Amino acid sequence: MNLAYDGSAFCGWQAQPNARTVQGCIEEAMRSLLREPSLSIVGCGRTDTAVNASYYVAHFDFDELDCADLRHRLNSILPKEISIFSIEAVKEDFHARFGARRREYRYYIHTAKDSFKRSYSHLYTYNLDIEAMNRAAGMLVGTHDFSCFEKLGADNKTSICTVFEAGWIEYEPEIPGEGKYYCFHISADRFLRNMVRAIVGTLLDLGRGKRPQESIPALLESHSRCAAGESVPGHALFLSKVDY
């Protein structure tokens, strides 16, 4: 199952009691349509409250069904914030989470007030040295312990991740406004909870001169969340690609 969702209306992907989640909404709809009260779906990863996905993969086990019809019926009853792109049969050993080899996130910022970007981009009004930010982002590439960017109290077995690429680009929005528009993209084999937002916050500090770019290697070695920058808001973050 390939889908997208606007995370602003949900408390993240993962189903949880007394909270509106993407997984919970989809499972409720599918259980009703397929008359399977115990049906569950497995997602390619967990996204936090307000975080979006422009491309997301999930799987579920079912013997036989009309995939096109199920997609149509799901889209007709799911909240407007969730769109199902496709449903197709896969091999029995396919696993949406453990089979994923590469995930990509994008984070958007704009430097001047923009009514059309406010819902999916972070307003950051400081002048930024993008070249310095890109040099620092390049220092994240490779296999490292990223615990300095991990949410405190997380229960991961390991904080080791391999980052394949990371960097900033300036882009022109469809409806131009004042200021500049930037997108940070990062791909890795896995991500820790809050990792991307903490990295972005740290690079923004660096871009406005609050920390030197040479501090990144020492920051990784510190394993201290307190040494990194503050996490940026979740509404401007998108899971954008998953490779298998």
What are these regions (language model features)?
Residues 1-244:
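Structured-RNA-binding interfaces characteristic of tRNA pseudouridine synthases
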